[in-house]
Curated annotation (Swiss-Prot):
Principal location listed in the UniProt entry: endoplasmic reticulum
Domain of life: Eukaryota
GOLD domain location: 53-138
Segments traversing the membrane: 201-223
Subcellular location per the Swiss-Prot or TrEMBL entry: Endoplasmic reticulum membrane
Glycosylation sites: N107, N156
Mode of membrane association: Single-pass type I membrane protein
Protein source organism: Bos taurus (Bovine)
Extent of the signal sequence: 1-21
Single biological process term from Gene Ontology: endoplasmic reticulum to Golgi vesicle-mediated transport
Protein name listed in UniProt: Transmembrane emp24 domain-containing protein 6
Length: 240
C-alpha cells in the first residue's frame, strides 16, 4: 500500500512541476481568430492633457527583456513643470516599477507571458499639457528570439557559426538603436528648450526696448515742460 501511495505522490508532483514550467500564453480568442499582439518595438511622441493619464499595452513572452524610455520634450500651457509619473504593470496588474522625472528608463525581465501595461500621468500639471517621446518594446536573447518557430533545424558547423555571428550583430545593432533613440529624445528636448529660451529673450528684449524708448520720450516731455516759459505782456506779468 505504501509503495502505491509513494508512486502516486511522485506522479502528482511531476504533473505540478510540468504545469508550472509551461508558458503562460494568453488565450487566442474565439474560434480560429488569432490574438493581435502588435510589434515588438515602438517609438513615438504623445501629448498628455493637464491632469490626464495615457496607458499602452505591450505583449511579451515570459523569457524576454522589457525596456521603456521616456523624455518630456516640452510643456504647452501656463505651467513649466515637466515632471511626469511613469508606471509599469504585469499582465496580472501588479506594479513593477515607478519613475517620476523629466526623463527615465524602466527595464525588467518578463517572467510571465501576456500584455504589460505602461502608463504616463501628467498629474502635477493642472494648467499645461506635456509632449512626451516614448521608446519601448521587448527583445529576446538566445534560441527563443523567434517564438513562431516550433523547432530549429539542424545545420552544419559553418552555417551555425554564421547564424551565431549574425545574431550577435543583430543584437548589438538593436542596442545601438535603443541608445540612439534615447539620445534623439534628449536632442529634441534640448531643441524645444532652446527655442523657448530664444522666444523668451526676444520678447524680453523687445519689452525692454519699448520701456527705454517710452522713458526717453517721457523725460524729454517733462524737461520741455520744466524749461517752458509762458509769454508775458504788459497786462499779464508774473507775480512776485
Amino acid at each position: 500500500m505504501f509503495p502505491l501511495l509513494f508512486v502516486a505522490g511522485l506522479v502528482v508532483l511531476n504533473l505540478v512541476s510540468s504545469a508550472r514550467s509551461q508558458k503562460t500564453e494568453p488565450l487566442s480568442g474565439t474560434g480560429d481568430q488569432s490574438l493581435f499582439r502588435g510589434a515588438d518595438q515602438h517609438d513615438f511622441a504623445i501629448v498628455i492633457p493637464p491632469g490626464g493619464t495615457e496607458c499602452f499595452w505591450q505583449f511579451a513572452h515570459q523569457t524576454g527583456y522589457f525596456y521603456f524610455s521616456y523624455e518630456v520634450q516640452r510643456t504647452i500651457g501656463m505651467s513649466h513643470d515637466r515632471h511626469v509619473a511613469a508606471t509599469a504593470h504585469t499582465p496580472q496588474g501588479f506594479l513593477i516599477e515607478t519613475s517620476k522625472n523629466v526623463r527615465g528608463q524602466i527595464n525588467f525581465s518578463t517572467h510571465e507571458t501576456g500584455f504589460y501595461q505602461l502608463c504616463l500621468a501628467n498629474q502635477q500639471n493642472r494648467f499645461a499639457s506635456v509632449q512626451v517621446y516614448l521608446n519601448f518594446g521587448v527583445f529576446y536573447e538566445g534560441p527563443e528570439m523567434d517564438h513562431k518557430e516550433n523547432e530549429r533545424k539542424q545545420l552544419n558547423d559553418t552555417l551555425d557559426a554564421i547564424e551565431e555571428s549574425t545574431r550577435k550583430v543583430h543584437y548589438n545593432i538593436f542596442h545601438m538603436w535603443r541608445h540612439y533613440n534615447f539620445a534623439r529624445m534628449r536632442k529634441t528636448a534640448d531643441f524645444f528648450l532652446l527655442q523657448s529660451n530664444y522666444n523668451y529673450v526676444n520678447w524680453w528684449s523687445t519689452a525692454q526696448s519699448l520701456v527705454i524708448v517710452l522713458s526717453g520720450i517721457l523725460q524729454l516731455y517733462f524737461l520741455k515742460r520744466l524749461f517752458n516759459t509762458p509769454m508775458t505782456t504788459e497786462t499779464q506779468k508774473p507775480r512776485c
